[in-house]
Amino acid sequence: MEAAQQKNESVMDYAPDWTQISVLFFVVMGGGVLASLSALALAGTVVLMLILTPVFLLLSPVILPVGAVIALAAAAFMAAVTIGIAGAAALIWVYRYARGQPTVGSEKIDRARVRLFEAAEKLKAQLQYKLFNENSKANFD
């Protein structure tokens, strides 16, 4: 008797409890519902393709040019909006830079301006030196 009771207890240790059974039930039911919905979507797609394919073939000489015009108009509109946004961002950057507010890249602009000014000063000095030397040679000749 004790061996049967011990065997029964060991089987009960591996038996699923109520929460595991309920989770399994809801997972199977949810999977079934989702599989049914996907089957309905597939059936609807097939039916619509069967109905609309002849209509599309009959109207394609009209639909394709209209679609191309709409696509080009949408692309042009998106390009115009993008260019407008870029222009507005550039104007905001210039406004902030002119007012002395911190802007992205202003350090590079300032360094380039200083380097350009230094190069201009150096070129000015070189030209003055050359002109002075040419004038002094002309005076001695």
UniProtKB/Swiss-Prot annotation:
Expressed in megagametophytes (at protein level). Keywords: Lipid droplet, Membrane, Transmembrane, Transmembrane helix. A motif (Proline-knot) lies at residues 54-65. It is a multi-pass membrane protein. It comes from the Eukaryota. The chain crosses the membrane at residues 23-43, 46-66, 74-94. It is found in: Lipid droplet; Membrane. GO terms for biological process: lipid storage. InterPro entries: Oleosin (IPR000136). The keyword Membrane applies. One of its GO terms (cellular component) is membrane. Pfam families: Oleosin. The proline-knot motif may be involved in targeting to lipid bodies. Belongs to the oleosin family. This is Oleosin L. It comes from Pinus massoniana.
